[in-house]
Amino acid sequence: SRSTVPTLEAAKALGEIKKRIHIPIVADIHFDYRMAIAAIENGADKIRINPGNIGSAERVKAVVDKAKEYNIPIRVGVNSGSLEKNIVEKYGKVTAEGLVESALDKVKMIEDMGYDNLVVSIKSSDVLMCAKAHELLAPKCPYPLHVGITEAGTLFRGNIKSAIGLGIILNQGIGDTIRVSLTGNPVNEIASAKQILKTLGLRKGGVEVVSCPTCGRTNIDLIGLANE
């Protein structure tokens, strides 16, 4: 389970949340390195940061040192919407190559600080760019990859984008964990992610209902029956 930790109160709530769930909790950190430290101290099983928006190298190191103390993984997240200006200028625009360069630079920064308990994530709302970035990153990265199409959209549009993007990536054997990002109830994200994995033969369980699109031979309420 992933929870955003924008305040100290949110960080302190992690301990209570952990008492009520049976799965690991990931703290999503934006900008304030102190929230990462507080989240770790309050029981986060993993933290997600973008070192590029945490601040100075000293602040990143403070987070890395705390993660090392508690031996929890850091997910290094790179997003097409916040790619560094110098990399965008180098490639002329946001590109898959630029996303990979940014991710590997951040990984090296943390490795140089003496830590390698890492997970890497590259996300974009551009399906084909995201797929290409993962194809480029996978052979260069020894760490687990968290895969997702960010800002995919509302339930209908977001499910289609996520299914296509994740399908391309996962079908190449790339990816260790996934997230479907939808604007709506996050419970729908879980159902969609499970169905994508089942469709690709990567998850078992449940029943697959096979139903035709209806035709002139249909003489029952097939749509209602299938939905039921």
For the regions a protein language model found, what residue spans apply to each?
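Catalytic beta/alpha-barrel core
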Residues: 1-7, 24-31, 47-55, 99, ...
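N-terminal active-site wall of soluble small-molecule enzyme domains
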Residues: 2-42
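N-terminal loops that bind phosphate or other acidic moieties
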Residues: 3-5, 45, 66, 72, ...
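Glycine-enriched alpha-helix->loop->beta-strand junction motifs that scaffold or abut catalytic
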Residues: 20-23, 41-47, 68-70, 138-144, ...
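Hydrophobic or amphipathic alpha-helical targeting/insertion segments
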Residues: 23, 34-75
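Conserved radical SAM core fold
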Residues: 35, 53-54, 80-88
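Catalytic alpha/beta core domains of metabolic enzymes, predominantly
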Residues: 79, 87-228
